[in-house]
Amino acid sequence: MLIFPLINDTSRKIIHIDMDAFFASVEERDNPSLKGKPVIIGSDPRKTGGRGVVSTCNYEARKFGVHSAMSSKEAYERCPQAIFISGNYQKYRQVGMEVRDIFKKYTDLVEPMSIDEAYLDVTENKMGIKSAVKLAKMIQYDIWNDVHLTCSAGISYNKFLAKLASDFEKPKGLTLILPDQAQDFLKPLPIEKFHGVGKRSVEKLHALGVYTGEDLLSLSEISLIDMFGRFGYDLYRKARGINASPVKPDRVRKSIGSEKTYGKLLYNEADIKAEISKNVQRVVASLEKNKKVGKTIVLKVRYADFETLTKRMTLEEYTQDFQIIDQVAKAIFDTLEESVFGIRLLGVTVTTLENEHEAIYLDF
C-alpha cells in the first residue's frame, strides 16, 4: 500500500543546462594559451606554503584525479604541470548573467541552481517550438556563439531526470530521457549518482545491499520511510523516475552563517583558525538541522581598525561536510594579506543553499 499517491506528470519538458568546467573554461576563453593544459582554479601551493583548496578545474586536470574541494597541495602532487589560477569570481558572475540572459530568450521559467547551471521549463516557450531537443540545441548554439563557452544539456519530463541526463555526457553533451526510457536509465545507475542522495544515505543504502537503481526499486515505500523518514518517500519516487518539483523562476537563495565578535583581539594564526573552526561547527550544525547544503563559502574578517574584508569561494558540489567547509574557510583566510591589527570579528557563511535531498551532488 502506498502512503502517498504516485503522480507522474510526463507531459512537462524540462531542460537542465550545466556549463562545462565553467570557471576554468572562462579562463581558457580569455587566455587561449591555456587550452589543452590542465588548469586549476585555486591557490597555488607553491606560493602559499602548501595551503589552499581547489575550487574547480578543467577536464585536462580531472584526468589526473583532481577535483573540487581537494587541497591544492594534493592537486599539485597529482598534476605538477597544472596551471593554478586564483580565480576572478566577479568575472564569472558577469558571464553567468550573460548566460542567464540567453535562457530568458526562450522562457521565463528559469531556475538558477548556481552561477553555472539552471533548469528551464520549456513546455510552453517564447519560440513556440514543441521540440525540447531542438530548443536545447539552440541554447547550446547561442551560448557558444554569444559567450564562446560550451555547456551540456539534459532533457526529460522532470528536474531529477533532466539533471541526471546533463551529467551523463560531458562536455558538450545532449542527453534525452523519454518517459518510457526512465526505468532503463535508472536501473543500472549507481545509487551515489542519484542526485540528492548524500554520502551518509549512500552508506546506509549500501549496508542494506542497495547499490543501484534496480536495487532501490525492490524496496517498498513503507520500508524506505521506516528507514529514512520523509526522505524514504523521495527515494521511492526517485527509483521510479517521479519528481513533481516545479521549476521556480529566480528563486531567492538564503544563507546560513555564524560570526562572533571578540573582546580580546586575535593575533595568533592558530587561535584565529581555531575560531574559524568553531564558526564552521555552528554553521554545519545549522545546515544539518535545516537539512540544507550549500556550495559557496564566505569568510568575513573585521580588524581592530574596523576594516572589514569578505571573500568567498564557490565549489562545484553542494556540501554540508565540516571538513570541506573548514578547509575552504581556512584556505580563504590564507589568501588575505597580513595585517598589523588584531581581529575583532570572524564569520563563516554558506550560501547558494539547496534542500539536502533535492541538491545536486557531483558527479522530446
From Swiss-Prot:
The record marks 23 as: Substrate discrimination. One of its GO terms (molecular function) is magnesium ion binding. One of its GO terms (biological process) is error-prone translesion synthesis. Its main location: cytoplasm. Residues 14-198 form the UmuC domain. Binds 2 magnesium ions per subunit. SUPFAM superfamilies: DNA/RNA polymerases, Lesion bypass DNA polymerase (Y-family), little finger domain. Monomer. Poorly processive, error-prone DNA polymerase involved in untargeted mutagenesis. Copies undamaged DNA at stalled replication forks, which arise in vivo from mismatched or misaligned primer ends. These misaligned primers can be extended by PolIV. Exhibits no 3'-5' exonuclease (proofreading) activity. May be involved in translesional synthesis, in conjunction with the beta clamp from PolIII. This is DNA polymerase IV.
